[in-house]
């Protein structure tokens, strides 16, 4: 029987360091904001347990039609992403509208079965308790080619014209959800132009409430299925006829995808069964299941790795000016066509795994199945398992990954890899065998991917670290 699992209660690795944010988000690239950006070296590492995303509750199961129904909303919530004792963070999360406790960042996992359809009513619930719309958590640049609700029906989904440099957009937030990796029909694909606003009571007159493809796809869906799209929502159906694989869902609204995902709108969608899947018992398990008791130990774990930055009050930090990228402070509009807020890329300074900064996973001397997702907006990851997170790069791995699958499902045969290279949105389905590691060994999942393509390098103390895996007795 396994002993009580403990976490590493280490503070800063390697002592005290000066604050040097990762990659292009360097100290000199954030003029005027360093006093409110949280120094990542002040965040204790490995004091928090790795969260395992639970399974999303369904609303109804139609056994005759072989359809699982879900009603999934998008809401604003506060969550402990930084370690206990530090401020909570306001984020957005998906969750079952019938289960208020299911809203989280990242989302609960949708478990799907080959040949059994999943129908989701996606509801935009970004409203306050009075029914008024919530503004975005992050700065929205209205000068891009984007959803542009304030442009009305005639100017939605365009790049609006301004006679002077505008401030950020603060109106109701458009959303639309895309199943990334799914074989989706057009009306259920989450087109960027099929967005919709929340059903708020204070949407200004003249605003477009839906994107230019919304009504078209609504008509197609309602004609094909007995399901109505209500205001502030869309209904999508996924046939689940493709190979068993690791997919994920995320927001996809035109011109704000980067912001909506950064705010928290992402979750796993795991398709099982069918001729391409493996028989039960071949791979490590169990995986999380609906109704699991708190603290249940699983041996198949979805793992999403994302980079984030925080303000000193715990809120998410995102650049408010183009100057954060290349020091360009204008002229913007009308002196040029350069957008004043948007950054071509942004590399944050803190690594977040399954919604927690630098967590620890306590493992037993056995095999684990880890389903990795690179959920970063711009960062490539090169993952290794090592015993010293501060070792000179390239570090020597102590354990290989046995990659068994990728975005499209299982590989023809397992591939032994000393490192995993993943681009944003890519998945890697791997087995890690801890049976040969002495009990009590501290292992670290590190990143050797650069903070910035071609010009930067990973920061060993911050963006170069993920989480450790201390070995327990069994």
Where are the model-predicted features located?
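Extended terminal and domain-junction accessory segments
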Residues: 10, 26-75, 82, 138-171, ...
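Short Pro-Gly-centered flexible turn/kink motifs
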Residues: 118-120, 229-233, 422-432
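Alpha-helical secondary-structure segments
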Residues: 245-258, 300-302, 366-371, 445
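Solvent-exposed loop/turn segments at secondary-structure junctions
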Residues: 78-79, 126-128, 183-185, 254-258, ...
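A conserved hydrophobic secondary-structure block that centers on an alpha-helix together
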Residues: 222-256, 260
């Amino acid at each position: 029987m396994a002993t009580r699992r403990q976490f590493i209660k280490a503070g800063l690795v390697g002592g005290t360091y000066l604050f040097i944010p990762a990659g292009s988000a360097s100290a000199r690239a954030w003029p005027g904001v360093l006093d409110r950006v949280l120094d990542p070296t002040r965040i204790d590492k490995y004091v928090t347990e790795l969260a395992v995303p639970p399974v999303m509750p369904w609303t109804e199961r139609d056994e005759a039609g072989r359809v699982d129904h879900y009603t999934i909303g998008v809401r604003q919530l506060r969550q402990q992403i930084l370690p206990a004792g530090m401020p909570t963070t306001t984020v957005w999360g998906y969750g079952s509208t019938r289960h208020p406790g299911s809203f989280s960042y990242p989302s609960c996992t949708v478990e799907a079965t080959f040949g059994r359809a999943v129908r989701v009513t996606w509801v935009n619930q970004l409203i306050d308790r009075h029914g008024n719309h919530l503004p975005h958590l992050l700065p929205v640049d209205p000068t891009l080619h984007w959803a542009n609700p304030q442009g009305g029906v005639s100017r939605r989904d365009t790049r609006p014209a301004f006679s002077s440099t505008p401030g950020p957009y603060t109106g109701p937030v458009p959303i639309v959800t895309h199943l990334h990796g799914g074989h989706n029909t057009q009306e259920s694909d989450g087109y960027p132009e099929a967005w919709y606003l929340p059903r708020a009571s204070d949407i200004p007159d003249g605003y477009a409430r839906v994107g230019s493809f919304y009504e078209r796809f609504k008509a197609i869906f309602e004609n094909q299925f007995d399901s109505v799209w209500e205001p502030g929502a869309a209904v999508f159906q996924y046939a689940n006829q493709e190979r068993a694989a690791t997919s994920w869902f995320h927001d996809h609204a035109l011109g704000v995808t980067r912001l909506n995902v950064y705010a928290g709108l992402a979750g796993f969608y795991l398709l099982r069964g069918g001729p391409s899947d493996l028989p039960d018992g071949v791979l490590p398990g169990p995986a999380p299941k609906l109704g699991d008791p708190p603290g249940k130990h699983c041996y198949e774990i979805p793992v999403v790795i994302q980079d984030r930055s925080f303000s000193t009050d715990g809120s998410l930090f995102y650049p408010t000016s183009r100057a954060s990228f290349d020091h360009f402070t204008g002229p913007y509009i009308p002196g040029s066509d350069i957008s004043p807020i948007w950054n071509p890329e942004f590399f944050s300074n803190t690594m977040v795994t399954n919604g927690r900064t630098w967590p620890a996973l306590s493992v037993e001397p056995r095999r684990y199945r880890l389903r990795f997702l690179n959920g970063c907006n711009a960062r490539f990851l090169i993952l290794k398992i090592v015993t010293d997170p501060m070792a000179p790069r390239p570090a020597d791995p102590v354990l290989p990954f046995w990659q068994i699958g990728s975005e499209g499902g299982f590989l023809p045969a397992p591939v032994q890899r000393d490192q995993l290279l993943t681009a944003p949105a890519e998945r890697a389905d791997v087995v890690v065998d801890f049976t040969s590691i002495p009990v009590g060994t501290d292992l670290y999942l590190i990143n050797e991917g650069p903070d910035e393509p071609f010009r930067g390098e990973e920061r060993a103390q911050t963006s170069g670290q993920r989480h450790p895996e201390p070995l327990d007795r069994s």
